[in-house]
Amino acid sequence: MFAVIRTGGKQYRVVPDAVLKVEKLEAEAGSTVTFTDVLAIGGEQGVTLGKPVVEGATVTATVIAQDKLDTVIIFKKRRRQNSRRKNGHRQPVTVLRVSGINAA
């Protein structure tokens, strides 16, 4: 069984016991998060698409950790001007383990 959820402006295809990194959520490590924006659910019976969401469907996940992605380097240079700027950015993410998909 799989589901497609929407969180943080992105869509993720999830299966039970999958580990995924999503945009930062305000949740402590070890807590449970429930997603109600389920866009599609699939299994042996076929695929159910939502319009725009599947009514009554939820996906529950456990927060493993709050983390940051690798550094993305931003380097700007103006030629012949001895002008350069180097900056870095680390995007905060939440690491989740999907514990269950409820099709209801």
Curated annotation (Swiss-Prot):
NCBIfam families: L21 (TIGR00061). It comes from Acidiphilium cryptum (strain JF-5). GO terms for cellular component: cytoplasm; ribonucleoprotein complex; ribosome. The lineage of its organism: Bacteria, Pseudomonadati, Pseudomonadota, Alphaproteobacteria, Acetobacterales. GO terms for molecular function: rRNA binding; structural constituent of ribosome. Transmembrane segments: none annotated. Keywords: Ribonucleoprotein, Ribosomal protein, RNA-binding, rRNA-binding. Belongs to the bacterial ribosomal protein bL21 family. GO terms for biological process: translation. InterPro entries: bL21-like, bL21-like_sf, Ribosomal_bL21. Pfam families: Ribosomal_L21p (PF00829). Part of the 50S ribosomal subunit. Contacts protein L20. It comes from the Bacteria. The keyword Amino-acid biosynthesis does not apply. This protein binds to 23S rRNA in the presence of protein L20. This is Large ribosomal subunit protein bL21. SUPFAM superfamilies: L21p-like.
